[in-house]
């Protein structure tokens, strides 16, 4: 059997040694950065209440620049009620050189101020349309990047093969 490992990191403790280990041993790596600087720093302050974006971003760039081409990564952001303009976060990732991107909705109790609510859904749908236009414009300019939600098979969904065949163990 061929076993492949995935790791998710917020990047804070990444150093050259860990980057080398990840690039040698992990088939897939998920780089967790909530979005552009103000979005990430609002959700992920450091212990001294300073933002973490500027600490993490150079480490993530180094990881992907040194990553073997036969191994994968995604930079993964999160959109919340506080950044319903999440297409800006996707564009931030693309403009920073990340070719494989994903931005997922936050999951949380509605009592959290950042939680998505039913009344936010029209804005979320509108923002996906905005993102589609921006994505198409970048592709026309020759700037190729992938956005996970636009890569999903709309007829089968991302997990249909696994549901039909089992986990394979």
What does each model-identified segment do?
Residues 1-37:
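Conserved SAM/AdoMet-binding glycine-rich loop
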Residues 38, 42-61, 65, 69-162, ...:
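Radical SAM enzyme [4Fe-4S]-AdoMet core and its adjacent flexible, acidic
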